[in-house]
Amino acid sequence: MFRVERTVEFESWLDGLRDRRAKEKIATRLVRVESGLLGDWKAVGDGVSEMRIDHGPGYRLYYTIRGQVIVIQLCGSDKSGQGRAITLAKELAKSI
């Protein structure tokens, strides 16, 4: 079981999504994460991992785990902004 915490950067990105179906898929994914089901993910380095959402342009949710129970949503992107988002996620992870 995890508790999901979100950064301001993640909330801002999510609020800016116009694709309602994508928002629904992301919300569903985060509920599953709280149940311990991370699904499709991979490590991207420096303690940061990426959850992949197979919808539209390929959404990515970046997170780090602190302790045994907290998953912190750092930021999100689609496939086209992946490089910038990974860099931002790593910077945010260091500041937490």
Please provide the spans of the model-predicted regions.
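Enriched for short, Lys/Arg-rich terminal
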Residues: 3-4, 12, 20-23, 27, ...
